[in-house]
């Protein structure tokens, strides 16, 4: 397994991708999910039905004193992060762009939208929830619950961005797209036994393992 070559791991991002697997003759193929983990801009690993391997690999890296763990709002992402341990070092950050995409789904005026966006961009989650409640913004109950659930993962995005720190999980999303370019070739179907090897080989290539 690749490691960070002596460099401390300061950031990781986790996301899911889809791969089409072969089924018995006469049955339609099925899309199944795999998990992909990107360590900074250096290394990546994707696993199919093997979250334990993903967590073991992350544990083998050289962790910095503080490691930012980025992800979207899906529960599975945070379950894996939590299982990695290192609670005293791991700082979970909700993808700021996904947060704003979810905000955009709430029915409200442009002025209300801007007000809540400003509060959230500054990490003022409690104030944002209060604003939505106080102004009786239509259909905001679900979003308020979403904010409460992820409150500890919503930092001051503006300050992080100004400091040059990541505020989104774009790196792992880019990884998933690069994997898709290989595994979603026109008409491609994979046996479940071969999927792990296909993903590992593709990540090894992207990690530069085959460079001369």
Task: Label each region the model flagged.
Residues 1-212:
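Catalytic center-proximal scaffold of phosphoryl-transfer enzymes
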């Amino acid at each position: 397994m690749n490691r960070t070559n002596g460099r401390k791991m300061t950031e990781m991002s986790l996301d899911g991708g889809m791969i089409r697997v072969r089924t018995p003759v006469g049955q339609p193929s099925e899309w199944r999910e795999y998990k992909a983990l990107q360590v900074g801009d250096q290394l990546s690993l994707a696993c199919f039905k093997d979250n334990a391997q993903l967590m073991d690999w992350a544990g083998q890296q050289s962790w910095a004193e503080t490691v930012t763990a980025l992800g979207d709002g899906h529960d599975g992402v945070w379950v894996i992060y939590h299982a990695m341990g290192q609670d005293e070092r791991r700082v979970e950050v909700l993808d700021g762009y996904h947060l704003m995409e979810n905000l955009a789904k709430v029915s409200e005026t442009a002025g209300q939208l801007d007000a809540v966006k400003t509060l959230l961009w500054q990490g003022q989650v409690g104030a944002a929830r209060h604003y939505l409640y106080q102004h009786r913004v239509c259909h905001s109950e679900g979003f308020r619950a979403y904010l409460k659930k992820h409150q500890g993962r919503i930092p001051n995005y503006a300050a992080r961005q100004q400091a040059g720190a990541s505020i989104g999980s774009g790196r792992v999303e880019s990884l998933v797209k690069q994997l898709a370019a290989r595994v979603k070739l026109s008409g491609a179907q994979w046996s479940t036994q071969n999927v792990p090897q296909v993903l590992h080989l593709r990540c090894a290539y992207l990690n530069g393992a085959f460079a001369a």
